[in-house]
């Protein structure tokens, strides 16, 4: 194993352009790149700049296209709540496609930034893949992080939308996310356009600002994004 790894590593160092040209063949491209590495403006190198792909398509759709849609794509197993669930590629793509439509309904377009401030639940994965599906850039912030830290990430990313949940569960305690998010929004110089909040069962919170919308509501009105 170590010899194989060392050989691959050496190849990546000795001829990185050739190495990553071959690696690119392992994923799906809508348009294969002909320019592998642009070194004209160091240190701002550009990889695959004329290629077109989609990471959500590579994570989900390609497996469905290959006849594996019924296979398990995601397993959720919470040691805190004891909840367990599985999602096939088809089921996960459906959830992702609908939430991608919900993001677009909230004004999120290609290149826009979305902060994901959530516990480790399936909806966090859905949100990440939905951003990738429409070409938005997501920034994951650890759920429960202090308000000032979240505020700095709002300012750094200039996020248009923040996706969060009503709370997170940790050993021996429940962390209410909404007060932390509210304070972060007050502290941040950059102001988000919308907050999408997923209501966790039994721990629902009141949404009081026009900028605040529930995950359940936006999903119910959204169309899937192919």
Task: Please place each PLM-identified region on the residue numbering.
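Generic, well-ordered alpha-helical scaffold segments in large soluble proteins
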Residues: 63, 95, 99-102, 106, ...
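Conserved AMP-binding/adenylate-forming core of the ANL superfamily
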Residues: 56, 74-129, 146, 150, ...
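N-lobe entry segment of adenylate-forming
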Residues: 1-87, 91-94, 98, 180, ...
């Amino acid at each position: 194993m170590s010899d194989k790894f060392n050989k691959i590593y050496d190849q990546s160092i000795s001829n990185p352009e050739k190495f990553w040209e071959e690696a690119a063949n392992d994923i799906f491209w809508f348009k294969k790149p002909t320019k592998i590495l642009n070194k004209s403006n160091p240190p701002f190198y550009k990889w695959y700049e004329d290629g077109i792909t989609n990471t959500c398509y590579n994570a989900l759709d390609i497996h469905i296209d290959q006849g594996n849609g019924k296979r398990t794509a995601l397993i959720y197993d919470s040691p805190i709540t004891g909840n367990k669930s599985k999602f096939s590629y088809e089921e996960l793509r459906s959830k992702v496609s609908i939430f991608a439509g919900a993001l677009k309904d909230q004004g999120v377009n290609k290149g826009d930034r979305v902060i994901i401030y959530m516990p480790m639940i399936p909806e966090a994965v859905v949100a990440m893949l939905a951003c990738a599906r429409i070409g938005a850039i997501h920034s994951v912030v650890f759920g429960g992080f202090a308000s000032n830290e979240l505020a700095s990430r709002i300012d750094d990313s200039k996020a248009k939308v923040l996706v969060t949940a009503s709370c997170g569960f940790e050993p021996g305690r429940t962390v209410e996310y909404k007060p932390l998010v509210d304070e972060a929004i007050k502290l941040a110089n950059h102001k988000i356009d919308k907050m999408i909040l997923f209501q966790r069962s039994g721990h629902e919170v009141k949404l009081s600002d026009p900028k605040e919308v529930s995950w359940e509501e936006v999903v119910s009105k959204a169309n899937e994004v192919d």
